[in-house]
């Protein structure tokens, strides 16, 4: 198992956030656009071939598995967000620019590093979202992306940004951008666990930025590559999540009662309640907007929730947020943020 922890006690500060959630809603089982029966170009033919190979590998790797986890017995959202106009990288670009603008209203300085989080494919496989943002914003750092960790992606990006700033005193700002757009032939449904929506969010973090949400502790755990998990086995490892939450609180030197907001992933409400109970988190402090009208934004979920929460509350000095998330094959992550007014 891989485990990464940062407990720099506020070395990293959330300087600005932004989110984009499409207005259009669709039923999760409906494919918005069917792939063309006959490819209209060589590029489209290559893309369809890659998609077909990916799906064929999943079918051949194992037979479908019914997983008896409490998290897998959820009420599915009736409708989810669907973006029909913007591509994945266009959504990412929009929230990235907005986060930079909010941090520097009169200054267009590029962040030192850009980290992109996504699990869905770009509309055109020849394009790179990370490369596009690097070019558009003029970041001096090497572009890179984190994928296939679902909701844990943002937390790993936060950890990476903290590690980079700790090892390079010339680095002062990093932009984390997460975006998802689910296109055929891939389904929006992850078994009976949840349904996936489209959307994007960005978080700009800085070193010692003054007032704002400071990162107290981050913990990320992923299963060892030696652990065999079938591709069809979609579940949340609740025990791993509870353990990660406990470690994060211990490393920050905090008891659950000292937390003011608990922000779980919007995978499903049953999972959120079950994990909170097992981790002995104060139930009355859970911040869980109804996911029924947007679905689960996957990699973009945590940063989108952070933006929504920061726009919805007026925190006092010393108040804290605990955010946790999970991947669909055993990954788990948690972070604690503390507000400092001066």
Identify the meaning behind each predicted range.
Residues 87-104, 236-252, 305-309:
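Short, well-ordered amphipathic alpha-helical segments that serve as non-catalytic structural scaffolds
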Residues 183-186:
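Short, solvent-exposed loop/turn segments at secondary-structure junctions
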Residues 8-11, 109-113, 140-142, 168-174, ...:
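Short coil/turn connectors at secondary-structure junctions
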């Amino acid at each position: 198992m891989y485990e990464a922890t940062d407990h720099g006690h506020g070395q990293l500060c959330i300087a600005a956030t932004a989110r984009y959630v499409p207005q259009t809603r669709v039923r999760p089982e409906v494919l918005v656009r069917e792939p063309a029966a006959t490819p209209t170009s060589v590029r489209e033919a290559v893309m369809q071939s890659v998609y077909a190979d990916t799906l064929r590998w999943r079918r051949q790797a194992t037979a479908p598995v019914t997983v008896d986890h409490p998290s897998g017995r959820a009420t599915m959202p009736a409708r989810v967000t669907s973006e029909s106009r913007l591509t994945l990288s266009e959504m990412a670009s929009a929230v990235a620019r907005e986060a930079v603008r909010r941090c520097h209203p009169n200054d267009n300085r590029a962040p030192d590093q850009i980290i992109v989080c996504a699990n869905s494919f770009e509309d055109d496989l020849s394009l790179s979202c990370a490369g596009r943002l690097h070019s558009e914003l003029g970041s001096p750092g090497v572009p890179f992306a984190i994928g296939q960790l679902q909701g844990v992606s943002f937390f790993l990006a936060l950890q990476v940004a903290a590690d980079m700033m700790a090892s390079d005193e010339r680095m002062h700002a990093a932009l984390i951008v997460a975006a998802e757009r689910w296109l055929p032939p891939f389904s929006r449904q992850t078994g009976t666990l949840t349904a996936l929506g489209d959307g994007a969010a960005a978080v700009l973090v800085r070193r010692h930025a003054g007032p704002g949400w400071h990162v107290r502790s981050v913990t990320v755990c992923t299963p060892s590559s030696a652990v065999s998990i079938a591709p069809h086995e979609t579940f949340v490892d609740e025990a791993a999540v509870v353990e990660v939450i406990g470690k994060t609180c211990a490393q920050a030197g905090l008891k659950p009662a000292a937390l003011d907001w608990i922000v779980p992933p919007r995978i499903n409400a049953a999972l959120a309640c079950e994990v909170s109970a097992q981790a002995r988190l104060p139930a009355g402090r859970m911040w869980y907007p109804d996911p029924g009208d947007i679905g689960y934004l996957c990699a973009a979920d945590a940063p989108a929730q952070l933006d929504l929460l920061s726009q919805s509350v007026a925190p006092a000095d010393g108040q804290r947020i605990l955010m946790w998330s999970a991947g669909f094959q055993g990954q788990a992550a948690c972070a604690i943020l503390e507000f400092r007014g001066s």
